[in-house]
Amino acid sequence: MENKNDMFNKTPKSGKPKMFRFNLYWMYGLIFIMLVALYMTNDSSGTKELGWTEFQKLAQENVFDKMTVYNKKNLVEATVKNGKTEQVFGNMDVSKIGVSPKVYVKIPSADKFSDFYDKAVADSHIDTQVRFEEGDDAIWNFLVSFGPIILLIGVWMFLMRRMSGGTGAGPGGVFSVGKAKAQLFDKDNDRKVTFKDVAGLAEAKQEVEEIVSFLKNPEKYTELGGKIPKGALLVGPPGTGKTLLAKAVAGEANVPFFSLSGSDFVEMFVGVGASRVRDLFRQAKEKSPCIVFIDEIDAVGRARGKNANMNSNDERENTLNQLLTEMDGFGSNSGVIILAATNRADILDKALLRAGRFDRQIHVELPDLNERKEIFGVHLRPIKIDESVDAEFLARQTPGFSGADIANVCNEAALIAARNGKKFVQKEDFMNAVDRIVGGLEKRSKITTEEERKCIANHEAGHATLSWLLEHANPLVKVTIVPRGKALGAAWYLPEERQITTREQLQDEMCATLGGRAAEELVLGKISTGASNDLERVTKQAYAMVVYFGMSDKLPNLNYYDSTGQDWGFTKPYSEETAKLIDTEVQKIINEQYDRAKRILSENKEGHSKLAQVLLDREVIYSEDVEHIFGKRAWISRSQEILELQEKANGKNKENADKEAEADATTENVTDTPTEENKTGKIA
């Protein structure tokens, strides 16, 4: 039965004869034949055949320097002495005679030659050297003559094979530099990643699963007039699972899957990128229907005319133009689906993003609480854990973590448990792994003085105090004065995963961040460089409030952000006067929050001092210790609110499910109740 969907029918083979295609192995064979012919038809200039009588006469005149007698061939090879060539060759041109001219003589036998030579030595006192050999080995002579050349050719072939080994284009060496480097996965490949291995990303998985479903069952969509998307672009931060999603597509789709990186198109040779694009789509058309996955497409898809090097004829632009033509030009790419991934969609060329090339943009964002729980469930499968490990608890402790970060946490926890000689990975190991990733390696060996420890303790206690007393500050988890990474102390928070952020929330976060510097000034009467990172974060946040969010009193409702990313920092969308006003507003916002931080710390001086002393004594404190000093927080965090709403929803779903189960059970009981006729054995 003929397939309804013509786009999935492979192109029929043309009746035209195939064009002649050059094979590099033919060149190797041609060189070998030429060498053999050169050896067999060796130029005889500089050599001469003599008769036995003439040879005897010349030998007695001491014309020859040395002779070689081949016993089996009854042949003598004699080399003429310098200055004696005229006696042998007459008036022949010197250039044809050569440097060491030779003569060849057919002798009656080796014994007769020996008799002649002995007599000539006795009578004429000749000094010619004579050597006897069994015979002339043609193969050996050939190897001696052309062995070095053959060796060079062999080395050259080996190097060319090595150079072309990574291109996937077979032999050809530098001649295959324009071939695509795509890796091909088909049904014969051993694939391990499926959609079951991709936790979270429900919406993104649905989009790509639809593409796979279309490839498996195209009639379901084509009967309604639908067409498969020509391309899908996966967009999202690093580590969120874009490439993993593509691997799952390769594992699920029963069609060939080409995979390569955007940088594979770029080469030092001009024109190679465009050639590789053409070759990639040629291979894809031959195996259609198929999927082509281009990872990090921003390496080749950057917007034209906006390159930082200001090169008007950039090689990358030529490659992009060819890619645009192949994706949706006059040629037909029926059955070839393009899947690409990038974390810089803002710099991609607009022509690349339009419908007809990438019909779908699938946003792969950082996982939320439920998605992190699912991701932990996947990565905890191969790890031996005890009953203390709870995926939901770990998900709450890792806000803002990507899928790659969560995989790293699980691996670090297993390594920490193995380092400590444990048989199972415990909750404590996971918490240490989170601390290791967020704060860096713990450095208890770093020596600090008593004055430095006091300064660090007051600094961290200032952060903890303000984060506890401010409504919109991130909830505190842990504070330590043990050096980690580059920091001498650190505080861990559970960032609120907000969908929108208000001015008050930003101000509370800035105030809590400035709490360390404010505590140093209030308690110690001096400030240190320990707050440099805090000041950097606060400055960026205040600048964003003024320039991007329009939260300034003197510059309200204005946004100076260029979302296209094409200005390259060469221009500013505001005047010098406005720039000065921006600096003034940023300074004003920071000063207000710094004064606010000092005021709150002054009002809670006793609690701050107790917290700093506990830090000095124990080095590490948790939210329970802060709660013991300041009391329970008066506000509920957004994460806790979401958890409570989710628990209520789960409770309602469970209650509804129980009611449905009871109703089904009641219906079954009514249906199965026997009638009076059935009881007496009659047919109802």
From Swiss-Prot:
Annotated region (Disordered), positions in chain: 647-684
Compartments where found: Cell inner membrane
GO biological process, one term: proteolysis
Membrane topology reported for the UniProt record: Multi-pass membrane protein
Positions in the Periplasmic compartment: 43-138
InterPro entries: AAA+_ATPase, AAA_lid_3, ATP-dep_Zn_Metalloprotease, ATPase_AAA_core, ATPase_AAA_CS, EF_Hand_1_Ca_BS, FtsH, P-loop_NTPase
Main location as per UniProt: membrane
Chain ranges passing through the membrane: 22-42, 139-159
Cofactor(s) annotated in UniProt: Zn(2+)
Binding residues annotated for Zn(2+), in chain numbering: 459, 463, 534
Active site as annotated: 460
Gene Ontology cellular component terms for the protein in this record: plasma membrane
Enzyme nomenclature, EC number: 3.4.24.-
Enzyme superclass (EC): hydrolase
Note on how the cofactor is bound: Binds 1 zinc ion per subunit.
Signal sequence bounds: none
Keyword annotations from UniProtKB, A to Z: ATP-binding, Cell inner membrane, Cell membrane, Hydrolase, Membrane, Metal-binding, Metalloprotease, Nucleotide-binding, Protease, Transmembrane, Transmembrane helix, Zinc
PROSITE patterns: AAA
Biased composition (Basic and acidic residues): 647-662
Keyword NADP appears in the UniProt entry: no
Family membership: In the central section; belongs to the AAA ATPase family.
Its biological purpose: Acts as a processive, ATP-dependent zinc metallopeptidase for both cytoplasmic and membrane proteins. Plays a role in the quality control of integral membrane proteins.
Name of the featured protein: ATP-dependent zinc metalloprotease FtsH
Gene name of the record: ftsH
